[in-house]
């Protein structure tokens, strides 16, 4: 047992002072214990380096630095365990989540027989809102949701979640294709085909799962260059189509086309023409494989009651009086140069009058078309039209020669969501929810290539069954104009159909 020499000396001194008054005896005793203390101190074993914690026999600068570093590391670990509260004035992190919608199954669906090697696929169409078209006056409630750094993350989350087999996009910014769309879609297992009209900053895109399909042909349709059905003016709109072979069986495949038709509220005449050209050219391309399915999906800027829709989907043509009135007013309308620009880019700034904004941003509905051409503002009479303007009936003739198209949402949505299938031809109320306009503009069509065949029961056309449709929100579920944080990244909502093909 080790006893401190200093403690012993003090104890003895106290005892002698109290009980023995002889000074010499006290001095002698204290001297003896001082010597004993020194010997005991010398006999304490020296601790080996590293055998226990504590300072060395003498402190060096290296030792001090080492201890300082240990203390800093300990403080850093402790700080890492404590969450750092953001400054009270820091903005909250942007919510890149989105409203997830369910696929609604078609009742009484029955798959094809297994020996036919049927393939389940999903087809999406989505106008993703070009960044170059955005003006804040058009999206007064969108705030931070308009910034590409935020919208792009919402788009990425949405595409990853729905993961369609095939997809069509419109208003795809050309500048974002290499570093965003190709990287995102490539990472999700897609290949893509992108094309844009001359002088445009955005275009249209088709993408497909490379594990299932391989592109062997593509076609670009330039509506302005079509001399057989000349237009009144150049709009720079285009369409495109790809032929995709199945990886597991190259003798089988499909055709997929997309487009973005002329946007203007008074543009029904041009849309009727462009729709006729699109179906004609896609059908011509598809003649190489008569048994393959043909899908056409995109933003047609066409309400179901607009003239172009019944021209695409009824045989014989069934054009009601409302649609006839729309096309006649459109034919009589005279466009100005500025009206051929993009729909959002051409809108007025916040400093312009509200009346001008209203005039420029009307929707493609009968309420947006003047009752007579006399109401056309004189400032628009800037003759950009061609000298020869064919009558719209010539477009009807081309439509009648084309194969008929069936809208998959018109066919099936009333069966899965009847309370939201009250629009013309049983469509949902809207696919576009903007500030100045809300309506149904986007479609997924399938081409009926052989009208001489009677379509079997539970098939849309020969060899194609509709299995499910992506739910479209009710108007009552919507808020201000999209895009909005945590809701939708575009002013359009995506459509998607699940079909089985053989």
UniProtKB/Swiss-Prot annotation:
GO molecular function, one term: RNA endonuclease activity
Main location: cytoplasm
GO BP of this protein: rRNA processing
Biased composition (Basic and acidic residues): 341-351
Region (Disordered): 338-379
Domain of life, source organism: Eukaryota
Xref: Pfam families: Exo_endo_phos (PF03372)
Primary enzyme class: hydrolase
Disulfide partners: none
Subcellular location: Cytoplasm; Nucleus
Biased composition (Low complexity): 363-376
SUPFAM superfamilies cross-referenced by the UniProt entry: DNase I-like (SSF56219)
Keywords: Cytoplasm, Exonuclease, Hydrolase, Nuclease, Nucleus
EC number: 3.1.-.-
Any one Gene Ontology cellular component term annotated for this protein: cytoplasm
Family the entry assigns: Belongs to the CCR4/nocturin family.
Name of the featured protein: Probable RNA exonuclease C9B6.11c
Lineage: Eukaryota, Fungi, Dikarya, Ascomycota, Taphrinomycotina
């Amino acid at each position: 047992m080790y006893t401190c020499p200093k403690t012993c000396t003090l104890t003895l001194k106290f005892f002698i002072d109290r009980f023995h008054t002889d000074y010499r005896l006290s001095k002698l005793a204290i001297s003896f214990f001082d010597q004993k203390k020194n010997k005991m101190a010398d006999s304490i074993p020296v601790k080996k380096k590293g055998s226990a914690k504590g300072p060395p026999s003498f402190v060096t600068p290296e030792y001090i630095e080492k201890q300082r570093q240990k203390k800093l590391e300990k403080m850093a670990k402790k700080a890492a365990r404590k969450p750092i509260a953001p400054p009270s004035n820091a903005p909250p992190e942007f919510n890149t989540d989105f409203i997830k919608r369910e696929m609604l199954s078609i009742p009484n669906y029955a798959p094809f027989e297994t020996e036919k090697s049927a393939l389940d696929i999903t087809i999406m169409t989505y106008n993703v809102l070009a960044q170059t078209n955005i003006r804040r006056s058009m999206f007064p409630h969108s705030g931070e949701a308009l910034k590409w750094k935020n919208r792009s993350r919402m788009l990425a989350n949405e595409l990853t979640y729905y993961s369609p087999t095939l997809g069509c996009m419109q208003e795809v910014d050309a500048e974002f294709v290499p570093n965003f769309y190709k990287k995102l879609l490539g990472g999700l297992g897609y290949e893509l085909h992108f094309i844009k009209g001359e002088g445009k900053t955005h275009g249209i895109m088709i993408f497909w799962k490379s594990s299932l399909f391989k592109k062997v042909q593509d076609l670009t349709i330039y509506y302005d260059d079509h001399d057989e059905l000349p237009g009144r003016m150049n709009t720079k709109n285009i369409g495109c189509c790809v032929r995709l072979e199945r990886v597991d069986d190259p003798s089988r495949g499909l055709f997929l086309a997309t487009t973005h038709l002329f946007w203007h509220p008074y543009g029904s005449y041009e849309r009727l023409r462009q729709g006729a050209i699109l179906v004609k050219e896609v059908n011509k391309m598809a003649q190489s494989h008569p048994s393959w399915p043909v899908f056409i999906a995109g933003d047609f800027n066409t309400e179901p009651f607009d003239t172009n829709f019944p021209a695409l989907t009824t045989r014989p043509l069934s054009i009601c009086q409302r649609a006839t009135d729309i096309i006649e007013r459109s034919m009589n309308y005279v466009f100005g140069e500025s009206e051929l620009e993009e729909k959002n880019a051409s809108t007025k700034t916040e400093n312009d009058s509200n009346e001008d904004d209203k005039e420029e941003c009307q929707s493609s509905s009968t309420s947006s078309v003047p009752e007579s051409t006399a109401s056309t503002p004189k400032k628009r009479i800037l003759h950009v039209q061609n000298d020869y303007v064919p009558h719209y009936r010539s477009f009807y003739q081309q439509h009648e020669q084309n194969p008929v198209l069936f809208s998959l949402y018109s066919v099936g949505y009333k069966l899965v969501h009847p309370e939201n299938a009250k629009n013309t031809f049983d469509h949902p109320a809207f696919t576009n929810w903007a500030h100045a306009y809300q309506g149904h503009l986007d479609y997924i069509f399938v081409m009926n290539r052989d009208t001489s065949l009677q379509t079997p029961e539970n098939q849309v056309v020969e060899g194609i069954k509709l299995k499910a449709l992506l739910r479209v929100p009710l108007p009552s579920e919507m808020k201000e104009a999209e895009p909005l944080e945590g809701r939708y990244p575009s002013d359009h909502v995506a459509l998607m159909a699940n079909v089985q093909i053989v």
